[in-house]
Amino acid sequence: LYMSMQAFAPCLSVDVELGVAPSAAAMIRSVFRVADAEMLRDVVSFAFPAVASYMLVGEDVEALQSLMQSLAILCEKCPHDILGWHDEHDTPSLQILLRIIERLLCMDEQVCGQAFGKFLVALFAQAGSMLAPVMPALLHALVAKLAQATMPDCTLTLLYALAYLMAHHAEAVVAQLAATELEGGESALVTFVRRWLADVLYTTTPDMLQEHMTALMQLFQHWTPSLQHLFVDGDVLPAPDHVIMTRSRAKAYQQYEQIPASTKVLKLL
């Protein structure tokens, strides 16, 4: 394993020939998948700096997605080793990982797909209370990106990450989002809940959907006054009887009844 990392890690560079970095990243991901935790512990101090260095400067989407999956695997298989690592300047790995997340959130939406979501949740699960000092900024960044997201993969990824935090830290998350104002004056909580209730059922993976349902239950139990007057789309309203509708026209016409957000949560549950 160490020899393979010695071969692949130097290829994670923006200076190598086109196609080399994504190939090396894919190989690293494949090796991490089949390696057991004990083997991975021996290469964290060598592999993590190479992976992190590329992710802080690299632009290749394919390479970045493979490396996000690699980091998720490291977080799951040897969390104490990766979170306990420091660089030569005594910078903790968590600080480096948060810089990576910040950079990825500033990049094109196609970078923030399923691999990004799995990386985020794996890190959230293992870092736990270590994230407390940066949670306000992290939540703000995630919801701000969600507010601008147009691609389904990016939207569902951000919703999944936020749902995980809601499911496991509901009281703190609700309080922080309610106190965070986004551009335009709307609270981050209202923005998140509106988008969440609109798109959550597009989730098709059973375990992710279960996480969403757990999170929605937690949200309902921590309902706040700021959500009392939030109305969202409910059922599709029937077309007027006097209008002849073709299939395409009916789809374009679709209008929804407006229902309280709390009612929509109960319907989803």
What is the meaning of each model-derived region?
Residues L1-L269:
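Karyopherin-beta/Importin-beta family HEAT-repeat alpha-solenoid scaffold
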